[in-house]
Structures are given as structure tokens and as C-alpha cells.
A protein has these predicted regions:
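N-terminal, polar/charged subdomain of small-to-medium soluble alpha/beta proteins
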Residues: 1-99, 107, 111-117, 121-157
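Phosphate/diphosphate ligand-binding glycine-rich loop within oxidoreductases
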Residues: 102
């Protein structure tokens, strides 16, 4: 059953976000659980162990929001949810900066956990974002990983 009153919030922005404020916005009398995911800029690239100085994220305005909305609509069809917020930052980010916030509210915790995982897995592969990592030695585009593709296959079964 799809909840017609679900609160959906999608933002692409340069500025940081306040996890506490975004979580509070998901609170309502129908929700029994809220699950958040916060992605951060890591200091080391796990593939070549380069020490990262910064990461620059770019997106395709309009298309990015549309793709995120499609992902959210899929999650709404799969689970009974009461609210979803996706905030993704763009621009130059430094080590430990917040990149992405995914918050999901539901009547029941398992729905919130599953939907949050689903949304994040699909964001990693389907939302049009491009990343450039800058280290001491180089500046390079980040390629998609097979493990990210594998993560979405589990949801298609």
C-alpha cells in the first residue's frame, strides 16, 4: 500500500547539511522508525591507497533530481514509508566532509533500514554524479566499481 501523504525531499547543494535538522524534519506521528545514512569523504582511496586531499562532485542539473526521484518512487512501491530525504552535495569537498544524506522514515524499522539501503545502493550507480579525486600525486575521475553494480542486482531478485 502506497502512503499518499509521504514527505519526499530531494536537494542537490554545495553547502553542508545538518543531520539533526534533517532527521527532525522526518519526524511525524505515523513514523515508528527513522534510518539515516551519511556518506563522507574518505582520506584514502582503497584501490591505490593514495591520500586524498579533496573530491569534486559534478552533476547534471534537472536530470540528477529526476533520477533520484525515480529511485525514491521505486522504494515507495516496495516499502510502506512515511518520509524520505535525499541530500547530495556537489562542488569541492575536503576529507571528512559530508557528501550525502539519505533519511527514511517508516512505521516499522525494517522497512526504514531496507529502503535506506536500497536508495543508497541505487544512488551510487544510477544518479548522474561524477567524482574527481585529488591526491598529492594526481587528479583523476573516479570510475564506477563492480561492487556497486552488484549491490543493485540483489534488489532486482
Amino acid at each position: 500500500m502506497i502512503n499518499k501523504s509521504i514527505k519526499v525531499n530531494i536537494k542537490i547543494q554545495h553547502e553542508d547539511f545538518d543531520v539533526s535538522k534533517e532527521t527532525q524534519k522526518l519526524h511525524d506521528s505515523e513514523s515508528g522508525a527513522i534510518v539515516n545514512f551519511i556518506g563522507l569523504v574518505r582520506e584514502h582511496n582503497e584501490h591505490n591507497n593514495d591520500k586524498i586531499k579533496s573530491m569534486t562532485l559534478e552533476h547534471y542539473p534537472g536530470m540528477t533530481e529526476s533520477e533520484i526521484d525515480k529511485i525514491i518512487q521505486k522504494s515507495i512501491k516496495k516499502w510502506e514509508l512515511t518520509g524520505i530525504t535525499v541530500i547530495h552535495r556537489v562542488g569541492k569537498l575536503l576529507v571528512s566532509d559530508q557528501i550525502v544524506f539519505v533519511g527514511v522514515a517508516s512505521k516499522h524499522r525494517q522497512n526504514a533500514f531496507d529502503a535506506c539501503n536500497f536508495i543508497m545502493d541505487w544512488l551510487k550507480t544510477k544518479a548522474p554524479f561524477w567524482k574527481i579525486e585529488e591526491s598529492e600525486s594526481q587528479r583523476k575521475w573516479v570510475e564506477s566499481r563492480q561492487s556497486d553494480q552488484d549491490a543493485i542486482y540483489k534488489w532486482e531478485k
